[in-house]
């Protein structure tokens, strides 16, 4: 029988978009097993505790990205996870497409740059860290030909800072 609610899964099953999976440390290996079993692409969203699974995330062809955060809010009951800023550098170094998220309604979108700054403080190159806010998310969505870079013909919203915002928070 026809079920309209199932239509949302068609682009995922046809590999046109990844399935966005809310996941923490305790869920990540299960997400990878499901992605492999059903041959679907995924992004792991939130991903606190990802430093425990760098090799697995980097080697799985179904992982289209890891979107980390937010880091400045409390966890829900039962979701005791480690906040591992170094995970983003480790994943980036391993070739995983990484991005940063805030859950803006809970933590505020202004925290995005501060969170990227924490990655820089943990050793990530500032330019690579800024890519987590620009081209990397565009690649996860398959939109890198339209957004994510300042280049002729691309769509962009531009913010000008007087210093590197992930290095100088008051920029």
Question: Which positions does each model-derived feature cover?
Answer:
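Active-site core of metal-dependent hydrolases
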Residues: 2-84, 99, 139-141, 162, ...
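His/Asp/Glu-enriched, well-ordered alpha-helical/loop segment
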Residues: 64, 69-72, 78-163, 169-170
């Amino acid at each position: 029988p026809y079920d309209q609610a199932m239509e949302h899964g068609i682009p995922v099953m046809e590999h046109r978009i990844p399935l966005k999976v809310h996941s923490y440390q305790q869920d990540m290996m299960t997400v990878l097993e499901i992605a492999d079993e059903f041959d679907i692409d995924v992004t792991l969203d939130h991903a606190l505790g990802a430093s425990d699974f760098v090799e697995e995330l980097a080697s799985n062809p179904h992982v289209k990205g890891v979107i980390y955060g937010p880091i400045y809010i409390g966890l829900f009951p039962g979701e005791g996870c480690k906040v591992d800023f170094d995970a983003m550098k480790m994943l980036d170094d391993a070739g995983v497409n990484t991005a940063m998220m805030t859950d803006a309604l809970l933590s505020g979108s202004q925290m995005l740059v501060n969170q990227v700054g924490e990655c820089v403080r943990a050793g990530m190159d500032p330019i690579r860290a800024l890519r987590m806010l620009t081209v990397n998310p565009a690649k996860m969505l398959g939109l890198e030909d339209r957004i994510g870079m300042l280049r002729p013909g691309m769509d962009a919203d531009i913010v000008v800072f007087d210093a590197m915002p992930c290095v100088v928070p008051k920029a």
